[in-house]
Amino acid sequence: MAFYRSWIGGGGDLVRRYTSSMADDVEIAEEVVKILKTHVAHLAEVGVIPREAAERIAKALDEVDYDALAKGGFEDIHEAVEKWVIDRVGEEAGGWLGLGRSRNDHVAAAIRLAALRKLAELKRGLAALRCALAKRALQYADCAMPSFTHFQPAQAITFGHYLLSIDELVEEFSRALAGVEPLLKRSPLGAGPAGGVKTPIDRRRLAKALGFEDVVGNALYASGSRFFASAAASIVVSFLVELSRYVDDFIRWNSPAIGYVKAPDSHVSTSSIMPHKRNLVTLEVLRARISEAVGHLTALYAVQAKIGAGYSLDLQEATRHLWAILKIAGEGVEVLRDFVEGLEFNCEKARLDAETYYATSSDTAEAIALSGVPFRRAYFQLAEEIKRGSAKLLSPEEAVKRPTEGSANPEEVRRAASARLIFCKTPAF
């Protein structure tokens, strides 16, 4: 049902279906109602609407049936909720709901609040993943393996060290999120359609009532910009792209041709014709969805490009890509955490590869140099011995005992993993 455009007439089902955002607005519906309740209460506080009308509107908002609204044929959630209120309390009271606001500033506020809610859920998932990584890193602190550069066996590390490198990524991502969240915590309310409103709204007071920390200063920018969404989405996708490299490692290592990882039974499927197969389907799907997230980010950017300052309905099409990215991240982190908790690592095979493929050569060359031989001479000497098959290399256990902070030294791995686990015992983490 068209409400705002009813005075124009026309439209019809085709136009309504094509332009309606109701299917996407489910993501912000609760935030929209919360903002409206706070807005109406503020209007009553500053004395521009009758307090009785505000109370009646608030009661109607408490009773909103979201399923019924979704079937109402509306342009968007804002129109649907206002029509719901007016139908229940009449225009004499419900008609005040539209004062001092625009869909432009209100949807920008709802997107910010919904994004903050979803990021909070994501951060809880990240905390659980970090705990799983730390526990397994402690378990595999002494488990020697080759690292890989250029997908060739490289320097000897331990699987515990490898797991802590994922934890390091999560920590950096958490820092990046902490940097972008202040952008989301700035309120656009009171900006109106582009240049503010005549109603004497105290923007800072209204912002504080909703949990915002600041206001977006310029009204045109406040209601028409989606920079905050692009910034948050780009950070999340950057994390996912980096995470996909580890996902790909696990998929490769699950192959019996490499044989480092045995995936949990719950994460594998088999072939319809080859019953021996143990396909790591959860991580294959995650790998694909991370690529989809890159596409969503590109679409989010592209929708905003060249539409001019101020709100256009193009922006309605951008928001769904933000939600898709956050969903991919949240579900992916949960799946990876469950995988890490249940995987088995073949330390015997990994150690054998570290030995077989000269993964201790750099440490051996360093050890020779530290005994007084110039490093490059030691390097070429060892290279010649490897070529002849006569090299006497350090064992993987000897090689990983490096003195540097953050190294694969099992003691360093235990120190770092134990430090992480301390936080796992506190609800705040």
UniProtKB/Swiss-Prot annotation:
UniProt entry keywords in alphabetical sequence: Amino-acid biosynthesis, Arginine biosynthesis, Cytoplasm, Lyase
Top-level enzyme category: lyase
GO molecular function: argininosuccinate lyase activity
Pathway linked to the protein: Amino-acid biosynthesis; L-arginine biosynthesis; L-arginine from L-ornithine and carbamoyl phosphate: step 3/3
The EC number(s) this enzyme carries: 4.3.2.1
GO CC terms in record: cytosol
Catalysed reactions, as listed in the record: 2-(N(omega)-L-arginino)succinate = fumarate + L-arginine
Domain of life the protein comes from: Archaea
Record-level GO BP terms: arginine biosynthetic process via ornithine; L-arginine biosynthetic process
Principal place of residence: cytoplasm
Localisation: Cytoplasm
Entry-linked HAMAP family: Arg_succ_lyase (MF_00006)
PANTHER family from the UniProt entry: ARGININOSUCCINATE LYASE
Record-stated family: Belongs to the lyase 1 family. Argininosuccinate lyase subfamily.
Protein name: Argininosuccinate lyase
Source organism: Pyrobaculum calidifontis (strain DSM 21063 / JCM 11548 / VA1)
